[in-house]
Design a protein with these regions (language model features):
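N-terminal intrinsically disordered, low-complexity, charge/repeat-rich segments that act as generic
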Residues: 1-76
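Generic serine detector
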Residues: 20-23, 30-36, 40, 89, ...
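Short, charged beta-turn/beta-strand-edge "cap" motif at the junction between a beta-strand
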Residues: 97, 141-145, 149
Length: 149
């Protein structure tokens, strides 16, 4: 269970760091477009502002997604021990650790690798409700649950 709590906390930190980085990037783009616009006129200026606005909208979308993931992660009780795979479970399958939480992908953590799965991920859906020792077949591959918390 300690692994799950540490992974959960580390994932929170990564999300917060990424939101902070994107916010700084957004501020810089906004500042740069304002500064480049001073004393400029014409089509070149308008195109520059439009491109900056598109980039800001893209960053805003990324920040919004990260905030949604942060909210979803807050709902998970990392202290809870599970006997079957469900939201908040951390499990080993085919010598790989997985955390049923948010779509984050592979997370390098304390000299090991944990793959963060969303609740829509095909592997999660195939294994949901199963216990240690049980298997599921996905894309022609057998997945056996070796450990679960």
């Amino acid at each position: 269970m300690m692994l799950k709590t540490r992974v959960h906390d580390h994932l929170f930190q990564l999300l917060e760091k990424r939101v902070s980085e994107l916010s700084i990037q957004r501020t810089q783009i906004s500042h740069d477009s304002t500064e480049s616009g001073k004393g400029s006129a014409g089509d070149k200026h308008e195109v520059g502002i439009a491109m900056a606005q598109l980039e800001i909208e893209k960053i805003d979308g990324q920040i919004n997604l990260l905030q949604q993931q942060h909210t979803a992660l807050k709902r998970i009780d990392a202290q809870q021990t599970h006997t079957h795979i469900q939201i908040g479970s951390i499990f080993m399958c085919n010598e790989q650790w997985f955390y049923c939480s948010i779509a984050f992908g592979q997370l390098e953590f304390e000299q090991s690798s944990v793959f963060c799965l969303s609740l829509e991920a095909p592997l999660y859906l195939a294994l949901k409700g199963k216990k240690v020792g049980e298997t599921a077949l996905l894309n022609g591959k057998t997945w056996k649950i070796e450990a679960l918390s």
